Design a protein with these regions (language model features):
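Active-site rim/adjacent substrate-binding subdomains
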Residues: 1-140, 145-179
Length: 179
């Protein structure tokens, strides 16, 4: 499964809600997890693999969560989330963020320190969790993808100017790959 890069129009498409979790969607989720692990990522949204279903997968290991690991202890990894909705943001955290669809590019992004996320699981049941720190950042990043928002839209104007050349190069490479 290939991960699409910046410049591919699918990254700007809002996700289509999933009505029912089918065997095909479960297989898609597993393929997305495999692609995410192969790319050393912590999250992946369906748009990043050329699909538009409201689906994202996240796996932030406890050792990567630092001091927030105990706060997220009740959250089972990996998270396979259909129709995730983020609410109740609290606090703020600024940190370096990258994206598998933006290879070699990272920037400082401010996100909520903790959020509540509600979603439908692979079993069709509804779940809710309060997540913190890096896990909250990953959830917000992936749900942004599902809304057609990419992380560089969340960076300051100055940072965006500094990234302009890299983004243009990535967009050209993506366009060339599509032809």
């Amino acid at each position: 499964m290939d991960i699409v890069t910046y410049g591919n129009p699918v990254l700007k498409k809002p996700a289509v809600p999933v009505k029912e979790v089918t065997p095909e969607l479960r297989a898609l989720a597993q393929a997305m997890l495999d692609a995410m692990y192969a790319a050393d990522g912590v999250g992946l949204a369906a748009e990043q693999v050329g699909r538009t279903e409201s689906l994202c997968v996240i796996d932030v290991p406890p050792d990567a969560q630092g001091k927030d690991a105990p706060l997220n202890a009740g959250v089972k990894m990996p998270m396979v989330m259909f129709n995730p909705v983020v609410s109740a943001p609290e606090g703020s955290q600024r940190g370096s963020e990258g994206c598998l669809s933006f290879p070699g590019i990272s920037a400082q992004v401010t996100r909520a320190r903790s959020v509540t996320v509600d979603w439908m699981g692979e079993d069709g049941r509804h779940y809710s969790a309060r997540v913190h720190g890096l896990l909250a950042r990953a959830v917000q990043h992936e749900t942004d993808h599902l809304a057609g928002v990419v992380f560089v839209e969340r960076v300051s104007g100055t940072q965006l100017l500094l990234l302009k050349g890299k983004l243009a190069k990535l967009r050209r490479a993506s366009a060339a790959a599509a032809t």
